[in-house]
Design a protein with these regions (language model features):
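Extreme N-terminal starter segment of soluble prokaryotic enzymes
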Residues: 1-3
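Glycine-rich FAD pyrophosphate-binding loop
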Residues: 6, 18-48
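Hydrophobic/small residue at the entry helix of a nucleotide-binding pocket
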Residues: 11, 15
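Acidic-histidine catalytic/liganding microenvironments
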Residues: 22, 63, 122
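N-terminal FAD cofactor-binding segment of flavoenzymes
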Residues: 42-85
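Conserved N-terminal helical subregion
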Residues: 74-154
Length: 154
C-alpha cells in the first residue's frame, strides 16, 4: 500500500511530510506536483502571506516542519476581531495569556522552498515534480495513477 498525493502546495507537502514523520518512512508516499516550487508562477507558493495559529505551529514542530521555517516567521502579538457595521469587537493580546505569540505569519514562497527541501530528504517520500496526472484507474482493490511522462503509481 502507498499514498498518492496530487498537489504539492502547502497542504499536500505538509501531508506528505507528516505521513513520512509519523510512519518513520514505512508508508510510501508519492507526491505529484506540476510546478517546481522555485518557479515564480507556482500557484501555491506565491508572494502571499498566511497566518498560522500557535497551535498549528506547535503541531508543525511535533512533526519536524516548523523548525525549517521558524526563522522566516513573524509573531502575532495582537489580534483585533470586529464585524463591520456592528458595535462589538474583541482584541486578543498574547501577553494577556502569558504566551509569546497567538500565531505566526509566514510568506508562502519561503515556506514552499523549505518544504520541498525537507521533502527531498523525507524517508519514504518520492517527489514527482514537475509532473502531471494523465489518468486515474480505480478497481475494488486499488487505485493507480498514470503520469503524463508514463510513470504509473499504485
Amino acid at each position: 500500500m502507498s499514498v498518492i498525493i496530487v498537489g504539492g502546495g502547502m497542504t499536500g507537502a505538509t501531508l506528505a511530510l507528516a505521513i513520512s514523520h509519523l510512519t518513520q518512512g514505512q508508508l510510501p508516499v508519492h507526491l505529484v506536483e506540476a510546478v517546481a516550487p522555485e518557479a515564480s508562477n507556482h500557484p501555491g507558493f506565491d508572494a502571499r502571506a498566511i497566518a498560522l495559529a500557535q497551535g498549528t505551529c506547535q503541531q508543525l514542530a511535533r512533526i519536524g516542519i516548523w523548525q525549517a521555517i521558524a526563522d522566516r516567521a513573524t509573531a502575532i502579538g495582537t489580534v483585533h476581531v470586529s464585524d463591520r457595521g456592528h458595535a462589538g469587537f474583541v482584541t486578543l493580546e498574547a501577553q494577556d495569556y502569558r504566551i509569546d505569540a497567538l500565531g505566526q505569519v509566514v510568506e508562502l514562497h519561503d515556506v514552499g522552498l523549505r518544504l520541498f527541501r525537507l521533502l527531498q530528504d523525507a524517508p519514504g517520500v518520492t517527489l514527482h515534480c514537475p509532473a502531471r496526472v494523465a489518468s486515474v484507474s480505480r478497481s475494488e482493490a486499488s487505485v493507480s495513477v498514470k503520469l503524463e511522462n508514463g510513470t504509473v503509481l499504485d
